[in-house]
Amino acid sequence: MRSFASDNNSGVHPLVMEALNRANIDHSLGYGDDKWTEEAVAKIKETFTPNCVPLFVFNGTGSNVVALQLMTRPYHSIFCAETAHIYVDECGSPVKMTGCQIRPIATPDGKLTPELMQPYLHGFGDQHHSQPRALYISQCTELGTIYTPEELKRLTDFAHLNGMYVHMDGARIANAYAALNLSLKELTVDCGVDILSFGGTKNGLMMGECVIVFNKDLQSEARFIRKQSAQLASKMRYLSCQFTAYLTGDLWLKNASHANAMAAKLRAELEKLPEVTFTQKAESNQLFLILPRPVIDRMLESYFFYFWNEEKDEIRLVTSFDTTEEDVDEFIGLLKR
């Protein structure tokens, strides 16, 4: 069943599947001591910086937990937007695994600013308070919005000035860079991000993420934290080989650009309908809008999508690398009936 529910619902890109098949031909050493992982590590270092440490993990929550453990101790606090994945959608895993307090901050568009963070930065050195240590941001945000390089640099400078590390959740990072027409390095390393969760599952991979540690002070313990967090794959090559395919020939960019283009087409058609009200600026492959409840109920009979705020009749529509123009046309056609 085709849907606009999530980019997690899409399949695996054929080139990624070919890479998996090639990795499956013969036996290989486990736990990353294989040529496939060696190639993927080299590709990631070529893309970002030779000085990074890439760690392949199973999923997004795992990557976030590994990254945040590297940055914190249990008496620290982690700052994030109130819509952040680590606060809303990870079943308390970051709290359990780090022991840290999470401080959610209200934001109208999913993006944080120094001004929004400033009122929460207190208690430094006070033994009665959790000590601020990590800033978690998403690129794209959970509301589909995108940080510009200027916004990111201002935010990371502010965090570092206050003794905090910056972790970027890049589950949909490709969609952000496709929208801004910038390289992956320009919006991570060059903006002062300390650790990146580099995602691909939502953009054509079968599974897996990569924790990329840029900050040298956080690199030495990374392998041990990954193992302790149950994120070390014995058959590592099936995770790593996907990233080589993903970063070859700009497949990541082509997939994300197509998803963004399909979202733009869907948005353009929806804007023609008087009953549609958008609640967020449409910048990537996620659309947030309000429809009359009877219309939503009727559409759900044929298409699956998620409510974002059921009380307000707000829904989320997500396109992916394999969304077609026919998918968009059929959805709009049904909506107009």
Predicted regions, residues:
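PLP-dependent aminotransferase-like
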Residues: 72-131
